[in-house]
Swiss-Prot record:
Keywords: Membrane, Transmembrane, Transmembrane helix. The chain crosses the membrane at residues 16-36, 97-117. GO terms for cellular component: membrane. It comes from the Viruses. It comes from Human herpesvirus 6A (strain Uganda-1102) (HHV-6 variant A). This is Uncharacterized protein U91.
Amino acid sequence: MGKKSSTGTGKTNLKILACLLLIFLMATIFLLILEIISGQRYSNDDSEGVTAALKHVSTPTTNCTETTTPDSVTSQAMENKESMKKNEGEPPVWIQALTTTLSIILLVCIIMACIICSRTTEEEKSEMQSSASSVETLQSLNEAIFPKGEMNV
């Protein structure tokens, strides 16, 4: 009976490990998708800023006699830098929350897998020890019933 229950727990442990692996893979895929989404968002914002700057530069002036002073050029550059800094802000809160949650799930999966694997090896060791002790018990019973001198008959 002991062997049946140990193989049952072994199969259960394998099922749990398979589920943990599946959860681990899904969480990893979702993390990658979130990284791609947030990366695309920033690249779009940057290109929009560049497009706006190009439109500003390419607008024709009605008065050709106006000259551009170095101060106006540097102030425009500073404004562009500030607008770029705004676009480089942190990702939205929901992306940060999902990333944190998925990272915690990955960590829990790794810890649970380690615990299950160590528990499985401990069960296998105890099973081997119990089978070895039962073999020793059978040998001692065999020797008690049939002394060594009588077995060589």
